[in-house]
Amino acid sequence: MTDSYENLLKKAYSHISEKSASSERFVVPEAKAYVEGKTTILENFAEIADTVRRDKDHLMKYMLGELGTSGKIEGNRAIFNGKFEISQIRMIIKSYVDDYVICSECGKPDTRLVKDDRVLLLRCDACGGHRPVRKRKARTEPASENLEEGQVLDVEIQSLSKRGDGVVKMGRYIMYVSNAKPGQSVKIKISRISGSIVFTERAE
């Protein structure tokens, strides 16, 4: 009986280490996207969905909502109507993984989405934890296809760039505001537009 118990114990530990190792190796493939005509193509969309173990339609719906556009899944690719920066695509995928994949208690990706009384929960198979999937605020900013240099706007800083500048996403545009913090409301003047990147200065 002792040998049998020890064997069972070894098997249990091996399963734990296997799951732990798979979690530590969890790396979301970097988005490979490019602009083609008036569309943006995410070339490795299916690979990303498979890695995070989520339904392709669910991931696509989330991305379309965040980009404020329409699109379709075509084979292993996702096609979005409009021209978007690859940095914006990668930021949205990271937000999806944070909200719908990573356990907030143990930080592991061994999770699944389940519904309980119409509430969508993220349940972790690694630690047993669960939490409601937090819904992001509905997009209230305009799609703004007509931003112009010299235009003055009131904006709310949403995040920080690696350089420490405030970041505001507005439709297909990404604005950078110096000396600003997330949650801060500021009045800015557009100094330069390069594609979908908008450089600003404070407007007093």
From Swiss-Prot:
Molecular-function GO terms, alphabetical: translation initiation factor activity
Keywords of the record: Initiation factor, Protein biosynthesis
Gene3D superfamilies membership: 3.30.30.170, Nucleic acid-binding proteins
Domain of life according to the entry: Archaea
Short name of any one Pfam family annotated for the protein: TRAM
Domain TRAM per the UniProt entry, residue ranges: 146-204
PROSITE patterns tied to this protein: TRAM
Functional note: eIF-2 functions in the early steps of protein synthesis by forming a ternary complex with GTP and initiator tRNA.
PANTHER family assigned to the protein according to its UniProt record, in alphabetical order: EUKARYOTIC TRANSLATION INITIATION FACTOR, EUKARYOTIC TRANSLATION INITIATION FACTOR 2 SUBUNIT 2
Similarity comment text for this entry: Belongs to the eIF-2-beta/eIF-5 family.
Oligomeric and partner information: Heterotrimer composed of an alpha, a beta and a gamma chain.
Protein name: Translation initiation factor 2 subunit beta
Organism of provenance: Methanoregula boonei (strain DSM 21154 / JCM 14090 / 6A8)
Lineage, top ranks: Archaea, Methanobacteriati, Methanobacteriota, Stenosarchaea group, Methanomicrobia
